[in-house]
Curated annotation (Swiss-Prot):
InterPro entries: SmpB, SsrA-bd_prot, SsrA-bd_prot_CS. This is SsrA-binding protein. HAMAP family: SmpB. Keywords: Cytoplasm, RNA-binding.
Length: 153
């Protein structure tokens, strides 16, 4: 890609994540992709709503991230649900590895985006699942905020 070419900013969010989880720490990670995968991401043909991360041989992998097939890829296309390696610093990987072993904590994908250089990045978070009453509480607070906005206008 030339430097003069304008890159469309991609911003794919996991909307269910903030409702179902409480985020403890957030990280920005690079993704190891094949050629047709990055082209499909730039066309916003990806979904991270079912994605989760796990460790394999001290490497962080994301599973269940759906990157649809690229239309013009012919037989060079990729597998839409294959596992993809995430790139983080060693200190961050060690910290995540230690915390992910704790009971009740998981690593989930929050947002898939492209940076100003055109590289695909993913925002992940160390998260703890919310209880049912926590979910009800967050719904009530959102309703109250909407009511306050209506009153102000």
């Amino acid at each position: 890609m030339s430097t003069k070419e304008i890159v469309k900013n991609v911003n794919i969010k996991n909307k269910k994540a903030s409702f179902e989880y409480e985020f403890l720490e957030k990280y920005e990670a690079g993704i190891v992709l094949k050629g047709t995968e990055i082209k499909a991401i730039r066309m916003s043909k990806a979904s991270i709503s079912e994605a989760y991360c796990l460790f394999d041989n001290e490497e962080l992998w994301i599973k269940n991230m759906n990157i649809s097939s690229y239309d013009k890829g012919s037989f060079y296309n990729h597998d839409p649900l294959s596992a993809r390696k995430l790139l983080l610093r060693k200190a961050e990987l060690k910290k995540l590895f230690m915390h992910s072993k704790e009971k009740g904590l998981t690593i989930i994908a929050l947002r898939l985006f492209t940076n100003e250089r055109g590289y695909a990045k993913i925002e992940i978070a160390l998260a703890k699942g919310k209880k049912l009453y926590d979910k009800r509480e967050s719904i009530k607070s959102k309703d109250n905020e909407r009511e306050m906005q209506r009153i102000r206008i």
